[in-house]
Amino acid sequence: MERIKELRNLMSQSRTREILTKTTVDHMAIIKKYTSGRQEKNPSLRMKWMMAMKYPITADKRITEMIPERNEQGQTLWSKMNDAGSDRVMVSPLAVTWWNRNGPVTSTVHYPKIYKTYFEKVERLKHGTFGPVHFRNQVKIRRRVDINPGHADLSAKEAQDVIMEVVFPNEVGARILTSESQLTITKEKKEELQNCKISPLMVAYMLERELVRKTRFLPVAGGTSSVYIEVLHLTQGTCWEQMYTPGGEVRNDDVDQSLIIAARNIVRRAAVSADPLASLLEMCHSTQIGGTRMVDILRQNPTEEQAVDICKAAMGLRISSSFSFGGFTFKRTSGSSVKREEEVLTGNLQTLKIKVHEGYEEFTMVGKRATAILRKATRRLIQLIVSGRDEQSIVEAIVVAMVFSQEDCMIKAVRGDLNFVNRANQRLNPMHQLLRHFQKDAKVLFQNWGIEPIDNVMGMIGILPDMTSSTEMSMRGVRVSKMGVDEYSNAERVVVSIDRFLRVRDQRGNVLLSPEEVSETQGTEKLTITYSSSMMWEINGPESVLVNTYQWIIRNWETVKIQWSQNPTMLYNKMEFEPFQSLVPKAIRGQYSGFVRTLFQQMRDVLGTFDTTQIIKLLPFAAAPPKQSRMQFSSLTVNVRGSGMRILVRGNSPVFNYNKTTKRLTVLGKDAGTLTEDPDEGTAGVESAVLRGFLILGKEDRRYGPALSINELSNLAKGEKANVLIGQGDVVLVMKRKRDSSILTDSQTATKRIRMAIN
């Protein structure tokens, strides 16, 4: 009332009325800002003056039954007045304190499970180590980074279905959980969250954090894996950086890292096989990373790296529309060009056919350690602005841009012949020939490029052919900048096509990627990569090829044996024997193969010489194209452990050792498996081979006359039965087979049946 009187008093003075009515309100915008709309314009001020009131909080009426009207100190906790405009009660902040101290306690068992990502973050920070702070200029570039450590890689839709199924299992709505990961996660979470009292909405939010990759486009200098991004605000400022080592790793970073390594290995291997595309697909489908199928990871994981993108393209997935050259990702930001074939002469007068891009174009170039902006016209570099972590990185970027520009002075700077080949010994295309040449040595290129005087532009500096910086002169069109160039932020994915040589093109036919662009960097994967394809056996060197080849034969012995007998050529051509050939000295491969094939043919022809162990041991040698020669060998050489080691044609050696008693095969001391059937090389071996073509029916049956010797057996007619004397004077009943096709199985079953018949 006092205030109203005061205002009336003020209004009665003419001066007040005049000020309020005559003064122009020229800041209408400000008045509007603070008076229109439901959005609070100054939340902190609002909070402050609300909290200065006695009852700033509203609560459900039921609270009055759960909280006393006054606390121990006699302070009122809630007002008897209703909140205007709703049927809630006005509550004092002291009520919150009372509730926290005296309110009901629920079980906390679910908290670490629901807030798993937070608990894990605390652990990582607790065990992380922060090093010294350095003050220096930070070259940050915006990159798309993963801001959410410890997540699975489900798509938003897949995650939504999982969350609905876990949090609101009885809600209506079609939910189809199809992928392996969806089903596993749903089962796991349902078990974890039984009797959970935390609000379903909160649970849903937290599950989303755990299931979906969240990315942001952030300025980063340094590590980009999610465990570094979560502390970005602590590790880099505008002019300082703090060293930090994370206190733990998270699966999503490990998956990204291992995926890149697997993809690189697979692309490199596929590139040298007879049908690269088919091989690549076969390997992607048969590889597991950390126990998950690689193809499933490729479908969900947004990692953009050359090899990964080639694998995705092969699977028909969309990839980024940027293209790769010299390890840099190029994104055209303006302009356009048409392609035309042109013949050019190198400094060595070698003719190159290059596809010239005619027209003005601008690109951003982003590499691991350097970035640049490139403006070019037809076969002319107009401007290149580079920034990089160190001199070496800047040189790499300049070389790539100069080659990409296709300028004549670059082509004329070639000294010597260009004859670089890829892993499959095929010549590289001309642009990659030039690139390799100058990556080896760029001296002549920089010397021939030409220099120009430069203007003083803030943040830019000149660079001379010897890589020293200057404020007066610079290589023509080239400047070094303190600022990085941001990665292209648009995450659009386009439909691409891939040819059998793994060249990936967009729909206009521009080559985006090729195996030449796949990095040669070797790393050690964080998660176990299991390559089931025989093409990847050589990844761990010659020993692994040897062991894997013999393991494969033993695992598939049943089918191998039948093919050995009935269709040897098909067996020799199996791709599983391909890697083995690289271990056999080139000069002698053909002779070995001819020798072994002849030996095998004799085994098939001459009864009594079928010898399982020997077949297994020599089989891989028969896979090479055979040379006919009369040469006999008592041992065959394989190149392992840096030298030639011998495999004895008859008997054991350190390379191939079969233990008759344990039936175990060791190759170079490594276990290569157990033979399930018994290749006993004594009498049984001979007998089983001799009894090929005969079915052993059981013990001696006197009705079929006296026991014949093994040699007399050949006189039996098909279907005729007879007793036969074998080995140690035992007699068994046999019948000559009516069909020849089943002959092979006899030699396996004979041994077992003889034993049964005798015992």
From Swiss-Prot:
Instruction: Note one Pfam family from the annotation.
Output: Flu_PB2_7th
* Taxonomic source organism: Influenza A virus (strain A/USSR/90/1977 H1N1)
Which Gene3D superfamilies does the record associate with it?
Answer: Polymerase Basic Protein 2, C-terminal domain
Q: Please tell me which stretches of this chain the record labels as motif Nuclear localization signal.
A: 736-739
Which family does this protein fall into? Belongs to the influenza viruses PB2 family.
The record ties this protein, via InterPro entries, to: Flu_PB2_2nd, Flu_PB2_6th, Flu_PB2_C, Flu_PB2_CAP-bd, Flu_PB2_middle, Flu_PB2_N, INV_PB2, PB2_helical
Q: Which GO terms describe its biological process?
A: 7-methylguanosine mRNA capping; cap snatching; DNA-templated transcription; symbiont-mediated suppression of host cytoplasmic pattern recognition receptor signaling pathway via inhibition of MAVS activity; symbiont-mediated suppression of host gene expression; symbiont-mediated suppression of host mRNA transcription via inhibition of RNA polymerase II activity; viral RNA genome replication
Question: Which branch of life, at top level?
Answer: Viruses
Q: Cellular location of this protein?
A: Virion; Host nucleus; Host mitochondrion
What's a Gene Ontology MF term here?
RNA binding
Protein name as catalogued:
Polymerase basic protein 2
